[in-house]
A protein has these predicted regions:
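Long, highly charged, low-complexity intrinsically disordered interaction regions
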Residues: 1-93
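Core AdoMet radical
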Residues: 132-133, 174-176
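Charged catalytic cores and adjacent phosphate/nucleic-acid-binding surfaces used
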Residues: 74, 79-98, 116-121, 127, ...
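Short, flexible N-terminal segments of the mature chain
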Residues: 33-34, 124-126
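Ser/Thr-glycine-rich phosphate-binding loops at phosphate-binding pockets of nucleotides
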Residues: 103-109, 130-134
Length: 340
């Protein structure tokens, strides 16, 4: 077995299982080190016992490399594959089978843990036809939000990758902060160049309900906004975080009127919106995007978690934009932009 493939697969499965970042990083670092060695060097180092003298290779990763080069599936990988056979959820499989893409993922250009190429390649490998790269906007400095200049650089990187990846498409996008007044945290000219714009609240989450409603309605009514991300901002694990307060019926009605999709965020610590609000968004006639908000390749597998919640709450599959082809998705967003 190729040792790089073994190390990367272990990292993917650890991410899927919500392992600590430091554990995942050890395997991705080791994969990069081994991938950079000259032909035959890894075999030589296994033979003479010098593998662990390489920076970035420890006892655990050295063992995986040795087993892989010996022609075996590493024991640690076998164990993780066995654990991954258990489904993440008890439902959601029917909708998950219809999905073609994911509108919300991050790279190490902002607060993600992996390069753009790794995220795109992982999306391909799990069967997606397309995925949208949505790194953060400038104001979210804690997440290394992209300045206009860095976003322009990223567009060029994505264009280069797409030349090599066809027919898979990595679509350009952003997770754009909704500012206090409901305006969007990026230059309009740049937003017009993007394929998909996810808009999210990341600040003043405890704003007065009336003000938060005005803020969100203004944002989702903007023709440059395509998806409303994690609408309540809640966190349901760890120390947790309460939901932002707003008039959900008014916000979802505005989404339906503007053709802006409500995100069903699949991250286990978010599960946003809550079921009671998700059902109200269905009643409002809104579109939906079942997204992972992935910050690492293995987290792309979490989409079934959102699919289960969508099925439980009666979300019609035809109103889920992540079931659409890339062409249909882009027609939708371009038609929205034409009203700008």
């Amino acid at each position: 077995m190729d040792p790089v493939e073994a190390l990367e697969r272990i990292a993917f499965l650890l991410e899927r299982g919500r392992a600590p970042t430091y554990r995942v990083r050890a395997f991705r670092t080791a994969a990069a080190v081994v991938g950079g060695l000259a032909d035959g060097e890894a075999v030589r180092r296994v033979a003479d016992g010098s593998l662990e003298s390489l920076k970035g290779i420890g006892p655990k990763t050295a063992g995986v490399i040795s087993e892989a080069l010996g022609g075996d599936v590493p024991g640690y990988l076998q164990r993780l594959e066995g654990e991954a056979e258990a489904p993440l959820t008890g439902g959601g499989a029917e909708l998950r089978a219809l999905l073609r893409g994911d509108c919300h993922l991050h790279s190490d250009w902002s607060d993600g843990g992996s390069p753009i190429e790794e995220m795109g390649r992982a999306a391909q490998e799990i069967g997606h036809e397309w995925a949208v790269l949505t790194d953060h906007s400038p104001r979210l400095t804690i997440a290394r939000g992209l300045s206009p200049e860095r976003l322009r650089e990223q567009l060029a990187v994505v264009a280069d990758l797409n030349e090599r990846w066809a027919p898979f498409r990595l679509l350009t996008g952003i997770e754009c902060d909704i500012l206090d007044d409901g305006s969007l945290d990026q230059e309009p000219e740049l937003l017009d160049r993007l394929d998909v714009v996810v808009v999210s609240v990341h600040s003043k989450l405890r704003m007065d309900a009336a003000a938060m409603t005005r803020r969100m309605v203004a944002a989702v009514s903007n023709p440059r906004a395509d998806v409303l991300g994690h609408c309540t901002g809640r966190l349901v694990t760890g120390r947790g975080r309460p939901e932002s307060q707003f008039d959900a019926d008014e916000v979802f009605a505005a989404c339906a009127a503007a053709g802006t999709a409500v995100e069903i965020n699949s991250r286990p610590e978010r599960l946003d919106p809550p079921r009671r609000l998700l059902r109200r968004a269905v009643d409002a006639g809104a579109l939906f995007a079942v997204d992972t908000d992935a910050h690492a390749p293995g987290q792309l597998d979490w989409q079934v978690i959102g699919c289960e919640r969508a099925e439980e709450c009666g979300v019609p599959a035809e109103r889920v934009v992540t079931t659409w082809t890339a062409e249909k998705l882009l027609t939708w967003t371009r038609e929205k932009r034409s009203a700008a």
